[in-house]
Amino acid sequence: MHELPLVFFTVLGQSAAGLYLLAYASRKLGMLSENQLRHTNIAAFVIMIIALVIGGLHVGQPLRFFNMLLGVGRSPMSNEALLSGIFVAFGAATLLFTLLIKNKVLSELCNIATVIFGLAFVWSIPQVYNIATVANWFTVFTTLQMWMTLLVAGGALAILFGSQRLGAMAFLIGSIIIFATRAAYVSFLGETGPEISAEQAGFWSFQLVVLAVMLFVYPALLYRGRNSSVLLGLCALAVILAELSGRIAFYNLWQITM
């Protein structure tokens, strides 16, 4: 699948943005310690770097990334590239002022900027795919699923790194919205591309089954106080795999409208 690097780039990027957001909000609400926030920011930065490296495989040559920046302001893809770069830059600056230079004010400002540009980056992604020539993508469901990854995958990662209340809330809200809108999404695709959408049933089924299982697993683990990093890590991995499966289905829907 030629778009596989984009699958990882978008899902991991949205997951990292969600993790930054939920961790920072948890810290401000007194639900996360300074040390936990520091570890979470490191993890989120690593995830975003992995996303960029894998996404770069789709571009091919690294210098092509800079060519993409020439269309900033008029090209959604250029805007996405720019915002991803700014997102990573502020993430790096946050760690710089937290771990090395240790300036609390600058660290705080960079952390806020990281959250803001993470959200801007997530916003820019569906702008690339909401194009009239691809009827299967030209829908509000394209935008919706990108934001839901931020909630469910970002929420799962947030639970793993200590932001359990907001993480669980984000995962729950995102999962409910996914289940509530899936029938309408499939109905829409039944009109725009019935054959190609039918071929994605396996990917969507895997996604929904995993999310459904996690809706039972997370309450059981958190209610009983079983905060084993191994178990929560496996849960987060399962959720990310579910979102990757759903994103593969999304990219498989590509077809030019005649």
Predicted regions and their residues:
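Short, strongly hydrophobic alpha-helical membrane anchors
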Residues: 1-4, 258
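Membrane-interface helix-loop junctions at the exits of transmembrane helices
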Residues: 55-59, 186-187, 246, 252
